[in-house]
């Protein structure tokens, strides 16, 4: 009852429905927010504020993490600000304050349901699918620290790795075991997460999924960003895709289709399907929708990833430098690109590839 009333903003109903004998920290947090929203000017203001403060103290006694209490208090502030701006007729600012309040509420819920686990946001996409420009736009959001193209199993980088002594040890001594790689990776992520927590920013990891699915003789069974992190961190993740033919033509333009064998459209279709199978159940969004409506797309993406959104990203993303700029000639323009010319042999494959046709149907793209 109090949850439904809370979502509707019926603060008095939340207060009336609150059981004072409750041991549910969420109930006490909702009660505290409702008390703050119903404070009226007058001689009893101090008493009302004290009652709300005691509700938050009780929530903590019932097991709510300090971070969850702080997030809910910030939500209360944003709700009050949104109401004041709305009354003043400043609709745009009121909407932004309301969105921030919703974001703080999301964060509270996650902190309560996954106590003791730091939150990490992850993005998964294949090469040449528009992931870099989308990632730049995410990195341009307030309070976001994005680490681009991460995969501890990748062994196709530069021979010069002065900042990675364990990889140098592997090259000069012996292959590392999966457990040794995992231990090193977790220690690095723990340090990154600690830095982000101390700086008050959200850590976003852009997975280099190309390593897992489009390199070598077969897709990997192990996907380390998810498989290594899921036990220790609370992951909130999304998948982005592009028309597979455009992605494949992008691979050909870079010469990357030779990184998997056989280097055919049929094989690419099989590997793309394996990628989708692995991340089935995650929210999936299209690059084409991003290009035709970047603000709407990014607002929705931030909601899915539980990140704070700001429309100011449009003026900032062009100055952000990330690895993976494989095909985009402009740093600040968001627009659909014309399809690259289709080689004759690819056209023949396109008409006769069962896996690729299955992929198009699954993603609801036309050939």
Model region roles, listed by residue range:
Residues 202, 207-312:
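PAPS-dependent sulfotransferase catalytic domain
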Residues 5, 35-37, 42, 78, ...:
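Residue at a conserved register position within TPR or TPR-like alpha-solenoid repeats
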Residues 93-192, 208, 314-366:
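PAPS-dependent sulfotransferase catalytic core
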Residues 1, 30, 37, 73-76, ...:
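"A position-specific structural signal for the A-helix of alpha-solenoid helical repeats
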Residues 16-24, 60-74:
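Flexible helix-coil transition and linker loops at the boundaries of alpha-helical arrays
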Residues 32, 37-44, 67, 89:
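Short coil/turn linking the two alpha-helices of tandem helical-hairpin repeats
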Residues 3-15, 45-58:
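Helix-turn-helix repeat elements of alpha-solenoid scaffolds
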């Amino acid at each position: 009852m109090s949850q439904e009333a809370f979502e509707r903003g019926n603060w008095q109903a939340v207060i009336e429905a609150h059981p004072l004998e409750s041991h549910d920290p969420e109930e006490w947090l909702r009660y505290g927010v409702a008390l703050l929203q119903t404070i009226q000017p007058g001689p009893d203001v101090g008493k009302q504020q004290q009652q709300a403060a005691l509700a938050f103290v009780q929530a903590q006694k019932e097991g709510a993490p300090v971070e969850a209490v702080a997030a809910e208090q910030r939500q209360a502030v944003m709700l009050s600000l949104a109401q004041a701006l709305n009354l003043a007729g400043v609709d745009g600012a009121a909407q932004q304050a309301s969105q921030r309040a919703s974001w703080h509420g999301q964060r509270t819920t996650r902190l309560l349901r996954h106590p003791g686990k730091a939150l990490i946001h992850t993005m998964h996409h294949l090469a040449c699918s528009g992931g870099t420009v989308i990632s730049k736009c995410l990195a341009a959001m307030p309070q976001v620290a994005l680490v681009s193209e991460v995969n501890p199993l990748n062994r196709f980088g530069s021979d010069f790795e002065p900042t990675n002594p364990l990889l140098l040890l592997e090259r000069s001594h012996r292959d590392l075991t999966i457990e040794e790689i995992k231990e090193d990776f977790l220690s690095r992520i723990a340090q990154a997460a600690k830095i982000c927590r101390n700086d008050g920013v959200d850590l976003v990891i852009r997975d280099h999924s190309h390593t897992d699915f489009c390199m070598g003789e077969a897709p990997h069974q192990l996907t380390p960003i998810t498989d290594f992190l899921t036990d220790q961190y609370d992951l909130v993740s999304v998948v982005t895709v592009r028309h597979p033919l455009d992605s494949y033509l992008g691979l050909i333009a870079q010469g990357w289709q030779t990184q998997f064998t056989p280097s055919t459209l049929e094989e690419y279709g099989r590997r793309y399907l394996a990628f989708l199978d692995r991340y089935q159940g995650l929210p999936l969004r299209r690059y084409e929708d991003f290009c035709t409506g970047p603000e709407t797309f990014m607002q929705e993406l931030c909601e899915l990833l539980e990140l704070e959104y700001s429309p100011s990203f449009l003026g900032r993303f062009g100055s952000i430098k990330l690895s993976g700029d494989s095909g985009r000639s402009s740093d600040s323009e968001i627009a659909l690109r014309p399809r690259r010319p289709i080689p004759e042999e690819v056209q023949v494959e396109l008409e006769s590839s069962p896996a690729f046709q299955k992929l198009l149907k699954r993603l609801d793209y036309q050939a």
